Each structure stands twice: as structure tokens, then as C-alpha cells.
Amino acid sequence: MRTGKQYLESLNDGRVVWVGNEKIDNVATHPLTRDYAERVAQFYDLHHRPDLQDVLTFVDADGVRRSRQWQDPKDAAGLRVKRKYHETILREIAAGSYGRLPDAHNYTFTTYADDPEVWEKQSIGAEGRNLTQNIHNFLKLLREKDLNCPLNFVDPQTDRSSDAAQARSPNLRIVEKTDDGIIVNGVKAVGTGIAFGDYMHIGCLYRPGIPGEQVIFAAIPTNTPGVTVFCRESTVKNDPAEHPLASQGDELDSTTVFDNVFIPWEQVFHIGNPEHAKLYPQRIFDWVHYHILIRQVLRAELIVGLAILITEHIGTSKLPTVSARVAKLVAFHLAMQAHLIASEETGFHTKGGRYKPNPLIYDFGRAHFLQNQMSVMYELLDLAGRSSLMIPSEGQWDDSQSGQWFVKLNNGPKGNPRERVQIGRVIRDLYLTDWGGRQFMFENFNGTPLFAVFAATMTRDDMSAAGTYGKFASQVCGIEFGGAEPTAYAATADYAKALDKGLAPEPAAAESATS
């Protein structure tokens, strides 16, 4: 298994990365990037800790010990083992503050692995090349070398006023095909952690009007000639004492420019078919979304814990009004946990033999978090009061004259004054810093914004009058409604529906998605 040292050494490979106004010479050592690089290194090193060996690693069929990120769950019990793996990683690294560690990034490839053949059969313009084998080969490479392959799917936010605008946009597109590969030119507008990846996973999110040359699913090394990664300004803080979370690094969102970049056919998974891409805005990220829900449950748990700590330290925890408000936070956490458990218990087996959690339940669980994150943030900040804002600096606290006043200002019925400052600093990092503000924005748009979560999830079951909900209501009303005509969901390609409910496609299910 890869070590953190090996990972850090691999980053000094000539990749072209900007962070704000600075061009980064070495991602592993530059002050704007080194802290998060250390967090990814920590991810790898956790797998070598003897006390975590049984939780984070397994021995595969060939007798090789590997990270559990590569273990495929075969039943609900196996899925719970994977959940424990992800939870442990998240708890150990900045309390679940980073949504794009390697185990999350690499999860997208599970969707390919569940049914790789259709990515080749649905391609247009690949001239019979064995793209299915490309998928198998790249999955093997990821697993054998423990690589980190961030997602680079989001296209520029340019003219959204008409479908025709897609063709005029600077979206990444194929500009030439050769016997050896494709040449692409253009932009991917938002990717998280791209600067820290070994490879980047290129894909697209379908929009009406997208031309076939913009439909590209592939993987390339981050240091590929012609690739430049432009990261936003870093929000990392330099003082671990003052900023216990924000000092641990910024995973950095970025825009990637591809200037006539060559991609060998061996690294291409699918090209050319908007109708195929139309089926995957959510499905390609299914396992990532499950990981998101695990992290959101952990974040909800942290919010409850911080509320309990600060109200006990202040001395307000026994007040009925305060207790009732903390109870709301507990209810939020338990509701999130219920979505997670229910998705696991109502899962199904995919064509590839994996036991997959129920997408409708975990996606609506993600929506529940987004609907409530503003209100739970407000509750925590209000319960904390000035304790999350009026925090003495280390210099003020240690000063021989002023320090005594800050001890008195932070004294309470439980704990010591210094502990209240520590609690306040964590709350401040989460919600009252630019680092925390970026976290909030990431949650809003990570795995699609709220309206898109609802819209996309509603296309993954028959929500028409002929569907389960409609049939029951029709029965109660004593009517027959909507049963004759085929529904939109029924017309969806079987191979896509198999990712929603575990349907077993017939041999002909890999026919064109347009037929």
C-alpha cells in the first residue's frame, strides 16, 4: 500500500498549478498547498497504522493487503464495513471537513465497473476501439498503485440562455482524432483537489444542446503537457492553535485549461454520445453521493457535540429553551443517520455483483442536509453567542497582564476557561472564516445543488400516475389513471435503470440509448 511519503514525492512532477497570484513550484512544499497535501498523505499513512489495520484494510483474493476503498461490498454487512472505513478516515482527518479525499474521488469508477461494456457500445466516433478494456485497465492501475484521481466534470458557467449556446461555449471538446488518440481543447470550470491528484477524471454533466464532441469521459495524468490548473485563492490559515481546522489545509477548487492536449485512446472510456451522457448526471456519482451522506451524518454529529459542549461550558444547557434547541440539532442528526441506514438496508445487487445502497434514499438524505444546514448553523452560532467570535489570540492569552482577564471572561460551571476558547475556535473555523464559508459553498454545490438533487432523483423512479405512488392513490380514489401509456421512466434505457434498482438487463439492453 502507498505511503504518505511516496504520495508527496510523486507531486513534484512538473505539473503546472497556479494558486491565486502564485505559480506553484512544488505542490508538496509550497505554503499555499503543502498543508492539504499533508492531509492526503495522512490518508495514505492511516492505512499503515496497526490499530486501524482491520478497519481500513483487507486482504484480497490474491493474498495482497489493500485499502478497503478497493473492496466491493457483496451484501448489506459488507456495505456497513465500507461505511465504517469512510467514517474512520473522515473522523481522523479534520473532522470530515474534506469532501474530496482519494476514497471519494475514486468512487466514481465503481459506476463504470458495475457495467463497463455500455460505455464502449454507446460511444460514437471511437471506431470499434476497446474502451471497455480501457476501463478495466485503468481500474487496475488505480488499485495497484493506490492513486488519487479527482473529478473534473463541470463545464463553464457561460451563456445559459439557450441550448444552442452550448456549442459556442469554451467547454472542453475533441478537436482532432488520430490513430493514437484524441486531441482536446477547452476548459473544465470547477474541480476540487485537481492540483493534488495523480490523474484527473474527465467527464461531462449533460445539458440540453451539448454537442457530441464535448462528451468525453477519460483520465489523464495531472502533469500532462498542455494542462494548466488555476486554483482560486487559498483560505488556509497558518496557526494551528488559533485555527485548529482551517490550518489543516485547503483542498482548493480550480479551473483547468486544456491547450490542445493529447489523450491516448487507452485512457478514453467514452466519447460522442449526448444521449448516453444524459443518463449519467447523477448515476456516475452514485457512490460518491453515498460517501457524501456519510460525511454529512458525521458533520451533523459534530454540530450536536459542539452545541452540547458550549452550552454546558456557558451554563445554559439545563434551560428548557436551550435544551429544546439542542434537541432540534439531535433530531437533525438522527434524521440524517436514518437516511443512511435506510439506504443500506434497502439496497440491491448491481449487474457487477456489488451491493449498492438505495439511491433515492441517500440522495434525498443529501437534500435534507442542504435544506437544513442554514438553520442548524444559525442554532449553533446563536447557542454559542460571543464565544464563537470574541476569542482571544494566543498572544493576548499568554500576555502576563491581559491573560488574567481572558481567564475570567471565559470561566464557566464546567471545564476550564482555555477549553471554552478551544471550542469557540472550532465553531469559528467552521462558520465564521473564509475557510468555513468555502466549506458552506462546497456543500451547496457538491454533487449538484439542491434543486438539481431533487430534479435528478425524481427521474430515477416512476413518479407518474402509473408509478407506485400513483397506483396506490388511484386505488384509494377508486379510479384507473395513467396505466395505459408508457412513462418517461419506463422509456429510460434498461442499463441505466439497473443502476437505480438492480434490474437485470436482458442481453439486448446495451442497445442504443436513443432506440
Curated annotation (Swiss-Prot):
Binding site residues for substrate: 100-104, 203-204
Pathway(s) it belongs to: Xenobiotic degradation
* A Pfam family per the record: HpaB_N
Keywords, comma-separated and alphabetical? Aromatic hydrocarbons catabolism, FAD, Flavoprotein, Monooxygenase, Oxidoreductase
> Mind listing the GO biological process terms from this record?
catabolic process; protein homotetramerization
Signal peptide location: none
By sequence similarity, the record places it as follows: Belongs to the FADH(2)-utilizing monooxygenase family.
Q: What does this protein do?
A: Oxygenase component of a two-component system that degrades 2,4,5-trichlorophenol. Uses FADH(2) supplied by TftC to oxidize 2,4,5-trichlorophenol (2,4,5-TCP) to 2,5-dichloro-p-benzoquinone, which is chemically reduced to 2,5-dichloro-p-hydroquinone (2,5-DiCHQ). Then, TftD oxidizes the latter to 5-chloro-2-hydroxy-p-benzoquinone.
Q: What is this protein called?
A: FADH(2)-dependent monooxygenase TftD
Origin species: Burkholderia cepacia
Gene encoding this polypeptide?
tftD
